[in-house]
Amino acid sequence: MSRKPSGLGRGLEALLPKTGAGVVRLPLASIRPNPRQPRKRFAEESLKELADSIREKGLLQPLLVRPQGDGYELVAGERRYRAALMAGLQEVPAVVKDLTDREALELALVENLQREDLSPVEEARGYQALLEMGLTQEEVARRVGKARSTVANALRLLQLPPEALEALERGEITAGHARALLMLEPEDRLWGLKEILEKGLSVRQAEALRERLAMAPKRSAEPSPLSLELSRHLGLPVRVVGGKKGKVVIQYRSLEELEALLRRLGYQA
């Protein structure tokens, strides 16, 4: 049995008519891309293929735009917009709607969520943008037609350090690896990322990193901001103990890590 589109999907379909009614032709130069577009990466080869198709057959599905200043802002159809630019079109079919910032962002997000190649990081950042506009996780879940737990789990990815998010976006680690890193303490996540990348760990092996760390003595307090910053800089777990006087404890787990640390600190054996 076919399933009806849920959440915002019905709203996007309603705004893009199946017939020519309500569709106008606009100069492509009058349309500006949406700076809040949830999707940041587009496959170049796929864009070229779409541009070739547009040159041959034209742009068949209209863009969704809203008036802004002396022109228009793109709401939905970023991939088609970019391909139209590559194809050298002067005019494009479009549907013009007056939309608030929230409505525009919601529609841009749902269009991207309907694509299978949206990255986990882009999805999480899209949800985060909706939260920053005042929606709760429950409201976000209802609008995109997903369970609240799905939204919450996606948002947890944003707790990872930037290096891990970049590795996930580049395809160097999978979402499973990212979830395994979230099982580690914040100050251990960069070390975990390094282990995964350098040793080519599987998701199951990455999940075992927590058990490996569990054998170490338990820390009695949450890491300080300075400890986290030093951990990020050195790529190893660091603890700063004390106030005006104290000690800095750098934890390494192999001779290779120690040698790399010494080189980073400028020590020549």
Curated annotation (Swiss-Prot):
GO terms for biological process: chromosome segregation; positive regulation of sporulation resulting in formation of a cellular spore. Disulfide bonds: none annotated. The keyword DNA-binding applies. Keywords: Chromosome partition, DNA-binding. It comes from the Bacteria. Residues 137-156 bind DNA. Residues 1-20 are annotated as: Stimulates ATPase activity of Soj by 8%. The keyword Glycosyltransferase does not apply. Belongs to the ParB family. Homodimer, probably via the C-terminal 46 residues. Dimerization of the N-terminal H-T-H region may require DNA-binding. Probably interacts with ATPase Soj. This is Chromosome-partitioning protein Spo0J. It comes from Thermus thermophilus (strain ATCC BAA-163 / DSM 7039 / HB27).
